[in-house]
Amino acid sequence: MDSQDPVPVPEIVWDLRKARSNLGKHKVSFEEAATALEDPLSTTKPDPDHSISESRFLTLGLSFRHRLVLVAHTDDSDEIRIISARLPTRSERYAYEDDNLQQI
């Protein structure tokens, strides 16, 4: 790869039925969740407790609606699949804010 070549960006995908269910249950659309994944200040950590067959991750990021959103997803080289999304708990919000204050 030439140093001038752009880095390929994985496509963000999801199941439409799961997206409708998630919106009803958590009031967060997967469209909004996808924008939280693009937050440059987002934090991502592995989520091994919720899957044995695939690597899952939890990303906490700010969405285009200026809401902090926790996104459960898989991440491979060519696509990111959103599994669920919700608003964070108080302690998750504090952790995000604390992590980003330390970067200033």
PLM feature spans:
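Ribonuclease/tRNase effector modules and their secretory precursors
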Residues: 1-104
